C-alpha cells in the first residue's frame, strides 16, 4: 500500500526528560522516526522538553519546539502549526498520555488532526486495565484473576477474596510507577494509596500474583495490510514479579521448547491484530514452568525500552519502520535497511546470544531500598553479544562499571554463607553476584532454584562459569584452558586473578600464542542473506568479519550505561563527535555498550563495535583497526578513566593530553598551575588518613567540602560542619589512601557560575556563561541554570572570560573545557575544571547555535576555530532567556533522601525558554513536573540558620495569596512579624505535619536540612512523605525564591484604594 498523500505535516511528541522507566531509548526511537518521516517527504514538527537529546537538534525535524509536554503547551503548538497528523507512539508513556489528553480536550478534532500509528481506541484498550481485561476475555486469552479499583477499600475487599500475595498495577503509568507486590493488607493500603495518586485516571488493577512464572516478551510489528511479524523474543532470567526493566534479559529466549515458543508467538500476533496496532508493540507473557499454562501480563502499544533492546539485539530498526508503517507503508514493500537485499517482512534470525543487565543507582544511593519488584528502579542498562550465553553474560557484567568484572563480588569471600543466602532470597539488584558466590561455596543448584525460581538452564550456566574458574586455578599457565576460558567470555583481568599474574601478562601470553578475538557482524538474518552492516561484536572463533579499511580512522569511546551523573548528554556529545570525524574525511569507529542510545545505531558511524568499555576489550579493537588515535573527552568519566590505561599500550589519546587531563584532577599539580596563572581557588588540602583530614579541616576552618579525587557526578561528596561529621565521613563514605586521597576545601557560600569553552590550542571560544539559581554547595547537575546570566556585573563577566582563557591555555586544552566558579564577596574563585565534554554541552549548543561537540572534534583533528568563523572570547548573547531545570526520579526510589547537596541526584533535565526570566522559569518548572499554582498552601519548616531568610519568603508567599503552615519554631517567628500562619504539630503528635502532607492539604513544602543523616530524622520523613504523596518539596531556599518569582509574575496586584 503506498504511503498516505492526504497528509503533509506530522507532529511528533517526544518523551521529555530522562527518568527511571523512560530513558534514552526514546531519543533513539524519536530520532529514527523523525528522519524516516523526512525521508518519505513529510514535514516533521517535533515537540519535546528535553534539550539533552539528538532528537531536539534542528537537523532532525523541520521545526523543533523545546517546550513543556503539557496539554496547555502542546495545544498551543497544534493551534499555531496546524499539523495534519500526530504521531504519539514514539514518546513513551508521555506521548501516549498526551494523545489521550488532546483527544479528550477536543484539541485534535477542533484542529482536524489525524492520529497516526495506533488508534486511540487501541491505546485505551491496551492501557486501561479494565478494557484490556475485557478484550482478553473476548479473545479467550487468560489473564490473572483481577479487579479494577478506584478506592483503597475496593482493593482490600478484592485482595481478601482471592488471597495474598497480589500485584498492584496503576493505569496509564510507565516503569510500574506506584505499583508493587503486596503480601498483606498493610502493604496493600500503602501501595494502592500511592498507585491511585500516580494514575492519571485514578485506577489500579489488583491481580493475583503469579510470581515465579517465567516472564517472556515478544516484540511484534504489524502494518495496515495486517502483515504481522515477530522481530525478537526475549526471556527474563528473573521470573515474574520483577519489572522487566529491572530484570536480566536474554535474547533469543533460551528455555522455551519449540511448542512453547510458537504457542506464545501465535498469542502475541493474535493480540496485536485484535488491538489493531499499526507499528511496534511489546507483549509480556507469563509461562508456567511446569505446564503449557500461560497468562498475558500486559501490552505496550508503542515503541518501548524493550523495542530499543530488540532493535540493537537484532539490528532491525523498529522505530524507523514503525514510523513508516504509520504513514501507510507496509512491511512487504520496505527493504530491511540492514541487509539491503531482503524485505522488512522477513523475521530476524539470530546466530548469537544477547544479554541485557540493568544499571542501578545504588552506588549513589547506598541507603535506597534495593529490593526489586514491579516498580522499576534501574536508570539504564548494558547489552552484550556473545556466541554462548556465558560469554554474553560475562561481557555484560563487565560493562556495568560497578567495579565487578565477573560472576561474584569484589570481596565476596568475606561474606558469611548465611548472609549470602539471605541476600539471594531478598531479590535485590546484587542477587546475580551472590548466586555466583553461593555456587563457589558449594550451595546446590536445587537450593538456589528453591530460593529464586530461576530456571535450571541458567543456574547450570552459572555453575559452568564457576567450573571454568576452578579449572583455571588447577591449570595455571595452560594455553588450552586459557582458550577455553576466553571462549566463554572470561576477561584477562579475571584469568590474571586466578593465575596470580597481571592483566598485562595475560595480554602478552595471548598475543604470543595468537589467542585473539574475531569480530562477527550483526546482520538480522544469521548470515542467510548478503549483508554489509558495519555492526560488530567480538568473540573467540576463527573467521573475522570486520575487515580493516585503508582510510585514516579515529576511535570514539562512548559513555556506557545511563546512570546518575552520566546521562544522555554524553551520548549527544559522542554522536556529534562521530559526525564531525566523518565530515573531516576520517573513518569514525565507535565502541559502546548501551542499547538505548543513538550512538549505538549502526547508521551513525562507519563502524560500531558493541563491546564492553574495558582496557582489554578496547585494546582488542584498536589492535585490529590501527586508528590514528582514540578520543576520550566525549564519553564522560567512563572514557576518561581509560585514557591512562590505553596510553600504556602506546595508544595515542587525541585532544587534550593525558598529562593535562591528570593535571586537572591531581590536587597538587592543579594548585601549582592556578598559582602560576594567578587564579584564586578556595583554600584546600589533601588527606590520606583520618588524622590528616582532621588537622587540615582545623587549619582551613569549617564548614568544609570533602570528596574523593577522580569522580563524576559528585559521588560521595559532602559538606561537613564539624569534626564529628568529618570523622564519620572519613570512616564510612570513603576509604582514603595515598593512591586515593580525599580532597578537603573551604566551603564558600556564593553564586555558582558554569562556563563551557572550546580551544584549538590558540583560540578560546566561550559559547556561554550560565548562572545557577541555587548557591554553591548544590551539585551543578541538580541546579537550575540560567542563560544569559541575570545578576552578574560587566566586571565579573570580564573576569570569568579572562580566567577561562587562562585555564584553557594553562591546561593546553584541545577540545572541550568545563569550569565551575563561585563568586563570593565579589571575588571570583575556581571550584573545579573538567577538561572534557560536560552535561551542559547539548543545552548550550542548542541555545547559542554553537555546535560545541562538532567544533571541539574539529579542533582535536587540527582544524582552527578561526577558520570555522569563530573569534576568541565570549560569543555574543542570544536574545531571550533560557533555563535548564533538573528532573528527579525520587518517587521510584524508596529511602533516598531528596535533599540537594554536592552529590548529584537528578536523572534528567528540561529546558524553558522565553523573553523574560519568570516566563522561562515557569516553563522549566512546569516541564520538570512541578505544578505551579497561583494560590494554595505552603508548609515551611527550616533549619535555624535559614529562619531569617525564610521569613522574607513567607512574607512574599502571604502577599500572593498563599496560606502558610509551619511548625512551632518557624510559626513563632512569623507571628512575631505579623504574618498569618497555621501552626502544625511536629512528628509524633496527633494530626501532625505528615498528616497534613498525606491528606493533600499542602501544595508546596519548603524544608531545609537539619544536620544528622539518620533515616529516622524528622526532616528525612517530611521530605520522603512529600515525594511519596506527589507534593513538590524544595530543599533549597534559592529554588523556593525562583518559584515565588514565577508565582508573583502570574499574580495581579490587589491593593485597597
Swiss-Prot record:
The keyword ATP-binding applies. Residues 133-327, 671-861 form the ATP-grasp domain. It comes from the Bacteria. Belongs to the CarB family. Binds 4 Mg(2+) or Mn(2+) ions per subunit. Mg(2+) 1 binds at residues 284, 298. ATP 2 binds at residues 707, 746, 748, 752, 777-780, 820, 832. This is Carbamoyl phosphate synthase large chain. Mg(2+) 2 binds at residues 298, 300. Mg(2+) 4 binds at residues 832, 834. Mn(2+) 2 binds at residues 298, 300. Keywords: Amino-acid biosynthesis, Arginine biosynthesis, ATP-binding, Ligase, Magnesium, Manganese, Metal-binding, Nucleotide-binding, Pyrimidine biosynthesis, Repeat. It is an enzyme of class 6 (ligase). Mn(2+) 4 binds at residues 832, 834. Residues 930-1057 form the MGS-like domain. GO terms for cellular component: cytoplasm. It comes from Macrococcus caseolyticus (strain JCSC5402) (Macrococcoides caseolyticum). The keyword Nucleotide-binding applies. Residues 1-401 are annotated as: Carboxyphosphate synthetic domain. ATP 1 binds at residues 129, 169, 175-176, 208, 210, 215, 241-243, 284, 298. Mg(2+) 3 binds at residues 820, 832. Large subunit of the glutamine-dependent carbamoyl phosphate synthetase (CPSase). CPSase catalyzes the formation of carbamoyl phosphate from the ammonia moiety of glutamine, carbonate, and phosphate donated by ATP, constituting the first step of 2 biosynthetic pathways, one leading to arginine and/or urea and the other to pyrimidine nucleotides. Composed of two chains; the small (or glutamine) chain promotes the hydrolysis of glutamine to ammonia, which is used by the large (or ammonia) chain to synthesize carbamoyl phosphate. Tetramer of heterodimers (alpha,beta)4.
Amino acid at each position: 500500500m503506498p504511503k498516505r498523500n492526504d497528509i503533509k505535516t506530522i507532529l511528533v511528541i517526544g518523551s521529555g526528560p530522562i527518568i527511571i522507566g523512560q530513558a534514552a531509548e526514546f531519543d533513539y526511537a524519536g530520532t529514527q522516526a523523525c528522519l524516516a518521516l523526512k525521508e518519505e517527504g513529510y514535514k516533521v514538527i517535533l515537540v519535546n522538553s528535553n534539550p539533552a537529546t539528538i532528537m531536539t537538534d534542528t537537523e532532525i525535524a523541520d521545526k523543533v519546539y523545546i517546550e513543556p509536554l503539557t496539554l496547555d503547551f502542546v495545544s498551543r503548538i497544534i493551534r499555531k502549526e496546524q499539523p495534519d497528523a500526530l504521531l504519539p507512539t514514539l514518546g513513551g508513556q508521555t506521548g501516549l498520555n498526551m494523545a489521550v489528553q488532546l483527544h479528550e480536550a477536543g484539541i485534535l478534532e477542533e484542529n482536524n488532526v489525524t492520529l497516526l500509528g495506533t488508534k486511540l481506541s487501541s491505546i485505551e484498550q491496551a492501557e486501561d486495565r479494565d478494557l484490556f481485561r475485557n478484550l482478553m476475555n473476548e479473545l479467550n486469552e487468560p489473564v490473572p484473576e483481577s479487579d479494577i479499583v478506584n478506592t483503597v477499600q475496593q482493593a482490600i475487599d478484592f485482595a481478601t477474596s482471592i488471597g495474598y500475595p497480589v500485584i498492584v498495577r496503576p493505569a496509564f503509568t510507565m516503569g510500574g510507577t506506584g505499583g508493587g507486590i503486596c503480601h498483606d493488607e498493610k502493604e496493600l493500603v500503602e501501595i494502592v494509596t500511592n498507585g491511585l495518586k500516580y494514575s492519571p485516571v485514578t485506577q489500579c488493577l489488583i491481580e493475583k500474583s503469579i510470581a515465579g512464572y517465567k516472564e517472556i516478551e515478544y516484540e511484534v510489528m504489524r502494518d495496515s495490510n495486517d502483515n504481522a511479524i515477530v522481530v525478537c523474543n526475549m526471556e527474563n532470567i528473573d521470573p515474574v514479579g520483577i519489572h522487566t526493566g529491572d530484570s536480566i534479559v536474554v535474547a533469543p529466549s533460551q528455555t522455551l521448547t519449540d511448542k512453547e515458543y510458537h504457542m506464545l508467538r501465535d498469542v502475541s500476533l493474535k493480540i496485536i491484530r485484535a488491538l489493531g496496532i499499526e507499528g511496534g508493540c511489546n507483549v509480556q507473557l507469563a509461562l508456567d514452568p511446569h505446564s503449557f499454562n500461560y497468562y498475558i501480563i500486559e501490552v505496550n502499544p508503542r515503541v518501548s525500552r524493550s523495542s530499543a533492546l530488540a532493535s540493537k539485539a537484532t539490528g532491525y530498526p523498529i522505530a524507523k519502520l514503525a514510523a513508516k508503517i504509520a504513514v501507510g507503508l507496509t512491511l512487504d514493500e520496505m527493504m530491511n535497511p540492514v541487509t539491503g537485499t531482503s524485505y522488512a517482512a522477513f523475521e530476524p534470525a539470530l546466530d548469537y546470544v544477547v544479554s541485557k543487565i540493568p544499571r542501578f543507582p545504588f552506588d549513589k544511593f547506598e541507603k535506597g531500598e534495593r529490593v526489586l519488584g514491579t516498580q522499576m528502579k534501574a536508570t539504564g542498562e548494558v547489552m552484550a553479544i556473545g556466541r554462548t550465553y556465558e560469554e554474553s553474560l560475562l561481557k555484560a557484567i563487565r560493562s556495568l562499571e560497578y567495579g565487578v568484572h565477573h560472576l561474584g563480588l569484589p570481596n565476596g569471600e568475606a561474606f558469611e554463607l548465611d548472609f549470602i543466602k539471605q541476600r539471594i532470597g531478598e531479590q535485590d539488584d546484587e542477587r546475580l553476584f551472590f548466586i555466583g558466590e553461593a555456587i563457589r561455596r558449594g550451595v546446590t543448584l536445587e537450593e538456589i532454584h528453591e530460593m529464586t525460581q530461576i530456571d535450571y538452564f541458567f543456574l547450570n550456566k552459572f555453575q559452568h562459569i564457576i567450573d571454568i574458574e576452578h579449572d583455571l586455578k588447577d591449570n595455571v599457565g595452560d594455553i588450552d584452558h586459557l582458550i577455553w576460558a576466553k571462549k566463554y567470555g572470561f576477561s584477562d583481568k579475571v584469568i590474571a586473578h586466578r593465575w596470580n599474574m597481571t592483566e598485562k601478562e595475560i595480554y602478552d601470553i595471548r598475543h604470543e600464542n595468537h589467542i585473539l578475538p574475531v569480530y562477527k557482524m550483526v546482520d538480522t538474518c544469521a548470515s542467510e542473506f548478503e549483508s554489509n552492516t558495519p555492526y560488530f561484536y567480538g568473540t573467540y572463533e576463527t573467521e573475522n568479519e570486520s575487515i580493516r579499511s585503508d582510510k585514516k580512522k579515529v576511535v570514539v569511546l562512548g559513555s556506557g550505561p545511563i546512570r546518575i551523573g552520566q546521562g544522555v548528554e554524553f551520548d549527544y556529545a559522542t554522536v556529534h563527535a562521530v559526525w564531525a570525524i566523518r565530515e573531516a574525511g576520517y573513518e569514525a569507529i565507535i565502541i559502546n555498550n548501551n542499547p538505548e542510545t543513538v550512538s549505538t545505531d549502526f547508521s551513525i558511524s562507519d563502524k560500531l563495535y558493541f563491546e564492553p568499555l574495558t582496557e582489554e576489550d578496547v585494546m582488542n579493537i584498536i589492535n585490529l583497526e590501527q586508528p590514528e588515535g582514540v578520543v576520550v573527552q566525549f564519553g564522560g568519566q567512563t572514557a576518561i578513566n581509560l585514557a591512562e590505561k590505553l596510553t600504556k599500550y602506546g595508544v595515542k589519546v587525541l585532544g587534550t593530553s593525558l598529562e593535562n587531563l591528570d593535571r586537572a584532577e591531581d590536587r597538587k599539580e592543579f594548585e601549582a598551575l592556578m598559582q602560576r596563572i594567578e587564579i584564586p581557588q578556595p583554600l584546600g588540602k589533601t588527606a590520606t588518613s583520618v588524622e590528616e583530614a582532621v588537622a587540615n579541616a582545623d587549619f582551613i576552618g569549617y564548614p568544609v567540602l570533602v570528596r574523593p579525587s577522580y569522580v563524576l557526578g559528585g559521588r560521595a561528596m559532602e559538606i561537613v560542619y564539624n569534626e564529628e561529621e568529618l570523622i564519620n565521613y572519613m570512616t564510612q563514605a570513603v576509604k582514603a589512601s595515598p593512591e586515593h586521597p580525599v580532597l578537603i576545601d573551604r566551603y564558600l557560600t556564593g553564586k555558582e557560575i558554569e562556563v563551557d569553552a572550546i580551544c584549538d590550542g590558540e583560540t578560546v571560544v566561550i559559547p556561554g556563561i550560565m548562572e545557577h539559581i541555587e548557591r554553591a554547595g548544590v551539585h551543578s547537575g541538580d541546579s537550575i541554570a540560567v542563560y544569559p546570566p541575570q545578576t552578574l556585573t560587566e566586571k565579573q563577566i570580564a573576569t570569568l572570560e579572562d580566567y577561562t582563557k587562562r585555564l584553557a591555555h594553562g591546561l593546553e586544552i584541545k577540545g572541550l573545557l568545563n569550569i565551575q566558579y563561585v563568586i563570593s564577596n565579589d571575588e571570583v574563585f575556581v571550584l573545579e575544571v573538567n577538561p572534557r565534554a560536560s552535561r551542559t554541552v547539548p543545552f548550550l549548543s542548542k541555545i547559542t547555535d554553537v555546535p560545541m561537540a562538532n567544533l571541539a572534534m574539529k579542533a582535536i583533528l587540527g582544524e582552527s576555530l578561526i577558520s570555522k568563523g569563530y573569534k576568541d572570547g565570549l560569543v555574543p548573547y542570544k536574545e531571550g532567556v533560557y533555563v535548564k531545570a533538573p528532573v528527579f526520579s525520587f518517587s521510584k526510589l524508596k529511602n533516598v533522601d531528596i535533599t540537594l547537596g554536592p552529590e548529584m541526584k537528578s536523572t534528567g533535565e528540561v529546558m524553558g525558554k522565553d523573553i523574560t526570566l519568570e516566563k522561562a522559569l515557569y516553563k522549566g518548572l512546569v516541564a520538570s513536573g512541578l505544578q505551579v499554582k497561583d494560590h494554595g498552601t505552603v508548609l515551611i519548616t527550616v533549619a535555624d540558620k535559614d529562619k531569617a531568610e525564610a521569613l522574607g519568603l513567607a512574607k512574599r508567599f502571604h502577599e500572593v495569596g498563599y496560606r502558610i503552615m509551619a511548625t512551632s519554631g518557624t510559626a513563632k517567628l512569623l507571628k512575631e512579624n505579623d504574618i498569618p500562619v497555621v501552626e502544625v504539630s511536629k512528628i509524633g503528635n496527633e494530626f501532625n505535619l505528615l498528616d497534613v502532607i498525606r491528606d493533600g492539604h499542602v501544595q508546596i513544602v519548603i524544608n531545609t536540612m537539619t544536620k544528622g543523616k539518620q533515616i529516622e530524622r524528622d526532616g528525612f520523613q517530611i521530605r520522603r512523605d512529600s515525594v511519596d504523596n506527589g507534593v513538590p518539596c524544595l530543599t533549597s531556599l534559592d529554588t523556593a525564591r525562583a518559584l515565588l518569582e514565577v508565582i508573583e509574575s502570574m499574580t495581579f496586584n490587589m491593593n485597597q484604594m
